């Protein structure tokens, strides 16, 4: 027998899959990006100043959000994030952009419009394993 019972997602007071305005989606991505940095930092994926995570901007498809150069992953807040265009110009934010982050992530986002986010890190364990020159 078919029932018209609402699904678990439909019963959730805030449906995370509900359509959002582009502005709300921007804030959502920035919040999740800041959380991702904190998680990466807590797990030890922020060795030195190397490493970056980006999220495509839903309002401007030629831009992405990225961490500022030299800031610990463990300290990054939404207000610290930089909006960078595909020419390397900081559109929003007052920190310097990591040029390596721009070089890597601008190419990923340009080549793969279906990709919303990308991460690159230099974890202690990753560097140790790579020094062994063994395939995964």
Say what each PLM segment does.
Residues 2-136:
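Glycine-rich flexible loops
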